[in-house]
Amino acid sequence: MEHYISLFVRAVFVENMALAFFLGMCTFLAVSKKVSTAFGLGIAVTLVLGISVPVNNLVYNLILRDGALVEGVDLSFLNFITFIGVIAALVQILEMILDRFFPSLYNALGIFLPLITVNCAIFGGVSFMVQRDYNFAESVVYGFGSGTGWMLAIVAMAGIREKLKYANVPAGLRGLGITFITTGLMALGFMSFSGVQL
């Protein structure tokens, strides 16, 4: 149990998708203007990561890995296209659920909801799972931990950006300039967790 808690904490803080690997920055910067919208997208990304990493773990271990289906047959060259297909299917299901049950969040996320399919944080989580050879339980913990870390980063950024609206920011730094500086400072803060041994 301690191993899984350590893996979750490491995925949230030490190996944060947004602030350690800078993955998913397009939606991170575009949707982090309001806390409510950022939280909604963070939940969506967490759900997609939390489901797609273990599902892709099963697909990889039962079908694509060398010798999984038939001894001597290696289908690992299909990794990328298969993983993207699974992620796209999960995002479409999530989009239908949000449209049906949470129309205000669906409208607030707009074009960024289908873009979760090509969000490199999602694909990065799946790729790290394969690279690190996680088992199914580890991939569940890692998927939800990575999503939680990304959500924590985007909600914190949205909170800071809401406060920056009332700050006296120099004219040359208004907008994305101060946002990039803030992201860098947040990344430095999260970098302090890198020395923590769990």
UniProtKB/Swiss-Prot annotation:
Pfam families: Rnf-Nqr
Membrane topology: Multi-pass membrane protein
Transmembrane segments: 11-31, 35-55, 77-97, 110-130, 140-160, 176-196
Single GO MF annotation: oxidoreductase activity, acting on NAD(P)H, quinone or similar compound as acceptor
UniProt keyword terms in alphabetical order: Cell inner membrane, Cell membrane, Ion transport, Membrane, NAD, Sodium, Sodium transport, Translocase, Transmembrane, Transmembrane helix, Transport, Ubiquinone
Localization: Cell inner membrane
InterPro entries: NqrDE/RnfAE, NqrDE/RnfAE_oxidrdctase, NqrE
EC top class, as a word: translocase
Catalytic activity, as annotated: a ubiquinone + n Na(+)(in) + NADH + H(+) = a ubiquinol + n Na(+)(out) + NAD(+)
Domain of life: Bacteria
Gene Ontology cellular component annotations, sorted alphabetically: Gram-negative-bacterium-type cell wall; plasma membrane
GO terms for biological process, alphabetical: respiratory electron transport chain; sodium ion transport
E.C. number(s) listed in UniProt: 7.2.1.1
Quaternary assembly: Composed of six subunits; NqrA, NqrB, NqrC, NqrD, NqrE and NqrF.
Role description: NQR complex catalyzes the reduction of ubiquinone-1 to ubiquinol by two successive reactions, coupled with the transport of Na(+) ions from the cytoplasm to the periplasm. NqrA to NqrE are probably involved in the second step, the conversion of ubisemiquinone to ubiquinol.
Family: Belongs to the NqrDE/RnfAE family.
Protein name, as recorded: Na(+)-translocating NADH-quinone reductase subunit E
Organism: Serratia proteamaculans (strain 568)
